[in-house]
Amino acid sequence: MKKHSARVAPLSACNSPVLTLTKVEGEERPRDSPGPAEAQAPAGVEAGGRASRRCWTCSRAQLKKIFWGVAVVLCVCSSWAGSTQLAKLTFRKFDAPFTLTWFATNWNFLFFPLYYVGHVCKSTEKQSVKQRYRECCRFFGDNGLTLKVFFTKAAPFGVLWTLTNYLYLHAIKKINTTDVSVLFCCNKAFVFLLSWIVLRDRFMGVRIVAAILAIAGIVMMTYADGFHSHSVIGIALVVASASMSALYKVLFKLLLGSAKFGEAALFLSILGVFNILFITCIPIILYFTKVEYWSSFDDIPWGNLCGFSVLLLTFNIVLNFGIAVTYPTLMSLGIVLSIPVNAVIDHYTSQIVFNGVRVIAIIIIGLGFLLLLLPEEWDVWLIKLLTRLKVRKKEEPAEGAADLSSGPQSKNRRARPSFAR
């Protein structure tokens, strides 16, 4: 099995969270080798002190990552659930899902400026915008961002990004947000299947089981409301959105690999530029053909549109750059936790019926998503854990028998001197 460096090689498409482009930076430094004095030091109190300090430092670093992980999970959950609910609310006054998609995608332009502000505030070696831009452009090749690269390596992802968001928003019009958020979690299963076929990722039986659970959950979700036209169309739209998202992710790994934070920020900003230059004509056509029509611009709920765009931008920022402070698995949990949040909101704001079939479908899809979060070496870790437990169980009876056998002997030894007197 191939083991990759965190900086040099791309993450497995299935191991990284949904739509994550970035890889871990700053972990390539080798551990400091012990000096001659440390090598000759006796394994005594000093060595034990150093080991305890290392363990304490390690535990503190892990606790810090877990703390940040909880914060990131809450941010991912709230931004994803909030954007979904706000989109549902927006469609009551503004029935234009593609226009909403176009408007929100334009905000992607802010990725690189926000990244550069963070770079100036945090980095010790500050670079100008031009220098940083040129350095990030190396991600696209030796020639940087040329017109050919723009149309061959950026434009297809811009189309997939737009389709993913449009299909998701259009599905919100047809079915409730709980079903939409649950079905979109099948994205992870589609990523595994595509990465197994296209990227030749390692075959894992548990992930095949997870993919089967996801497909079974989709079928059960369709059956939950009966085979009505709106329900079937809505479910088909969400599944198509999850498929576009999976295709986007796997193609990115195949064509571009993994990006550093600056490179990912530049790439996402380029998607925003592509959206402004080439997708703007579509909302205009939809408006004049009255497919997505509004009487006047004063009737547009600008607050809802801007709120949705900010929440979606926050979600993508945290999901793509949260890997700097915590584990990717914890970030993925935020998407799963948005399901009960949407369910509670739907329970009080809509006429959703949580019958047995729907609840089982939600549980099955959620279980499949969680199984896909298992690391590739999970079976090795499980075997080691079971082996340790067996060894401990064998040692405990042996220690108990040793204590029983040593008890009478010690009493006899203590009694002999007093008996001699």
Curated annotation (Swiss-Prot):
Keywords: Membrane, Transmembrane, Transmembrane helix, Transport. It is a multi-pass membrane protein. Pfam families: EamA (PF00892). One of its GO terms (cellular component) is membrane. Expressed at the highest levels in the adult cerebellum. One of its GO terms (biological process) is thiamine transport. Residues 25-45, 393-421 are annotated as: Disordered. It is found in: Membrane. Residues 411-421 have a biased composition (Basic residues). The keyword Protease does not apply. PANTHER family: SOLUTE CARRIER FAMILY 35 MEMBER F3 (PTHR19346:SF3), SUGAR PHOSPHATE TRANSPORTER DOMAIN-CONTAINING PROTEIN (PTHR19346). Mediates thiamine transport. This is Solute carrier family 35 member F3. The gene is SLC35F3.
